[in-house]
Amino acid sequence: IPSYSLANEKKQNLQNIYTLLQEKKFEEGIKNLQVLSEQNDINAQLLYSKILFSGDLTPQDFENSYFWGFSALLGGKKKASNILEKLNEYLNEEQIRDITTKLREFLEKRAYEKDKRAIVQIAKIYENFTEPPDLINAYTWYNIAVAQGIKTAKSKRDEVLNSLNEKDLLDAQSLSIKLFKKINN
């Protein structure tokens, strides 16, 4: 399937969800929204995060709202940062760390299912959302992203590469090769 038709299909699905919600078929709409979110559709994730935050159509669920909002942010939805800022008032550091771990595991599973966006999202977690930044793993995932044909990851990979020493770089490259094979198996 060409990626264009897949993107078109997701847009269609999101449109169906809006229609279901307008027709007050909330349960079905929310279920479909969850399915699309689990397919790493960042537009669906942002909407789902907002709904879980507001509690208008389903009970409030701040942890899941953070999970989906964070995934959308990592996928490039900058608007998600607004919801995450609000959620920071209700969640403690430990909860956020746990959510980040769960999200990384979710994205790794997606990456092994050949989801290219997930590969970059994982790299961003390691680079920007671990304390201290885990540059070995960030490089590993950016390196895989570039090898998978994601051109936008090249500058990030090279940037992280310049902050690694020789040993760490070799370790990261070995890990990249191993994970790349696992993804493309």
Task: Please state what every model-predicted region is.
Residues K24-E28, P59-F67, E94-E105, P132-N137, ...:
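Structural signature of tandem alpha-helical TPR/SEL1-like repeats
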Residues K11-Q39, E113, A118:
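Alpha-helical segment of the N-proximal tetratricopeptide repeat
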Residues E93-E113, T152-N185:
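Terminal, low-structured helical/coil segments at or just beyond the last alpha-helical repeat
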Residues Q15-T19, L47-S54, I83-Y90, Q121-N128, ...:
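Hydrophobic face of amphipathic alpha-helices that form TPR/SEL1-like repeat modules
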Residues I1-A7:
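Classical Sec-dependent N-terminal signal peptides that target proteins to the secretory pathway
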Residues K24-K25, E38-I42, S54-D56, G75-K78, ...:
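Short helix-capping/linker turns of helical repeat alpha-solenoids
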